[in-house]
């Protein structure tokens, strides 16, 4: 009898508050499923990732166009190497290429959790990711006016 494979879950976020919100959102999921983290290399993320499967991406900066190219190449590479079935992300911009290429190349399911900092207006990342998300969550009811197809999950 064949052993059923657990879904491969990519937990993708920027450092700082986005990482903290994703930690709150996923709780114990990483212990129960085949998960890996995808984020930026900072002192705090390196400490948190010490005992976790992870990938560090280059942060893209609008003023330095080459960083977007590097981030896209890294995103394609890691999507093809890791083959995530699901991406759970809180953004920010560094995760957009990974979501885009995973969706287009593999048909990966995407769960996006909008930042609690977005109370009445969105930042750029949710606007970009909304069209690729299979489940789009907002933390404030006022954000349902901006994203009417979203689900309000409450503040994490």
How should these model regions be labeled?
Residues 13-15, 33-68, 142-143, 153:
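Conserved nucleotide-sugar phosphate-binding/catalytic loop shared by glycosyltransferases and other
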Residues 86-105:
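An aromatic- and histidine-rich active-site surface loop
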Residues 14, 92, 113-117:
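Histidine-centered beta-alpha loop that forms part of the nucleotide-sugar donor binding/catalytic region
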Residues 10-11, 18-29, 42:
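Short amphipathic alpha-helix
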Residues 108-156:
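Active-site-proximal region of nucleotide-activated glycan assembly enzymes
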Residues 63-86:
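An amphipathic, basic-hydrophobic alpha-helix
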Residues 8, 34-37, 53, 109, ...:
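Residues at the starts of beta-strands that form the adenosine-phosphate
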Residues 3-10:
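Extreme N-terminal starter segment of soluble prokaryotic enzymes
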């Amino acid at each position: 009898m064949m052993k059923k494979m657990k879904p491969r879950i990519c937990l993708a976020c920027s450092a700082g508050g986005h990482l903290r919100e994703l930690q709150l959102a996923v709780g114990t999921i990483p212990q129960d499923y085949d998960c890996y983290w995808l984020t930026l290399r900072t002192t705090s993320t390196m400490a948190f990732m010490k005992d976790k499967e992870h990938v560090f991406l280059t942060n893209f900066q609008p003023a330095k166009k080459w960083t977007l190219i590097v981030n896209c190449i890294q995103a394609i590479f890691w999507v093809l190497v890791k083959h995530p079935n699901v991406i759970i992300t809180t953004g920010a911009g560094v995760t957009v290429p990974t979501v885009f290429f995973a969706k287009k190349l593999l048909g990966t399911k995407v769960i996006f959790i909008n930042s609690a900092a977005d109370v009445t207006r969105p930042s750029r990342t949710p606007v970009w990711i909304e069209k690729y998300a299979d489940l789009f969550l907002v933390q404030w009811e006022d954000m349902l006016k901006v994203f009417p197809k979203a689900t309000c999950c409450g503040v994490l």
